[in-house]
Amino acid sequence: MQTVLVKNRTWIWAVAAMVAASACGPKNVSKTTGQAYNNPKWGGFANPSYRGQETGPGLVLVEGGSFTMGSTEKDLQFDNNNAERTVTVNSFYMDEVEVSNLQYREYVYWLMRTYISYPEVYQRALPDSLCWRSKLAFNEPFVEYYFRHPSYKDYPVVGVNWQQASEFAQWRTERVNETILDREGIIKYDVVTDANDDNTFHTRTYLAGQYDFIKKGKKPLSDFSKKKKKDQKRFKVNMEDGIFLPEYRLPTEAEWEYAAQANIGDVNFNNVEQKKIYGWNDYTIRIKEEKEKDRGKIRLNAMVGKGDFGGVAGGPLNDAGFVPTPVYSYWPNAYGLYNMEGN
């Protein structure tokens, strides 16, 4: 979390005694030394052009800000573990939808195909399908079919613990950055032949220069530390080039609650006008103000009454959410995120 106060930082200011340096100077000239960037004559310090971070696949930008985090109800049991407080969250990217069975099956398939000599890696990543079992409930069809059957491919994956989810996020980091390098023509990567056991792409290992099995692509970068142009082809990307995406990870508690509240649609002159129970401006889970044909429909997948998980068969108000619904069900919130309530 970033606070207003700046601590443990040293700011260096260069002060000219007589004449202040003009802000209008050559774009690729250092304002510290006056030497040219990207010039072998001056050592070849690189200042690559950077147009901003690209949005990773399936992500949505969540604009940061301050919000009130914690429970609004009185702490009758005095647990003191969720008191209301003001928290500031930096801008971040978040998945548009929950991770689906199809996406997670892609992950475990990659592990099975890649770590041939280490089958336990694949076994360790499989979700716990036994989480469906419950006393006095017949959920065996979900135990057998929910994760594997194509009918459920767009449903959110369940039975994944924190460790498995963190490893999935790390795997996704490597695959996205690997794809970017191949797309930009910097490397020529064949997943089938090049990825096996220990020979798999990892961003940090790549940055450390530990890979010798990756083939060079057709569009190298420039190495300005070499004077001769024929020697200036560079096939290794550095973090300073701005090509790699940051690491994927699980959202923090504050980030998740901030994204779920979605107060961005209720701001008036730097103030949030009202607290919301849900991600929309209403106190009910049913649609009331839309067209008559939509009026009364449920906005989220939730149990609407004791034992009522899906509504009445054939009725217009049936949400059909007997189990988690597909990840693109219902309307997104103000940030464009789906199923931040219910499901």
Question: Positions of the model-derived regions?
Answer:
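Bacterial N-terminal signal peptides that target proteins for export
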Residues: 2-12
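Short, flexible, solvent-exposed loop/turn segments with mixed acidic/basic and small polar residues
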Residues: 9, 78-85, 145-147, 236-238
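Sec-dependent N-terminal signal peptides
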Residues: 12-18
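C-terminal motif of bacterial Sec signal peptides marking the signal peptidase cleavage site
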Residues: 21-23
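Functional-site microenvironments in short loops/helix caps that host divalent-cation chemistry
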Residues: 27-41, 61-62, 68, 73, ...
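A short glycine-rich, aromatic-capped structural motif
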Residues: 51-142, 153-177, 342
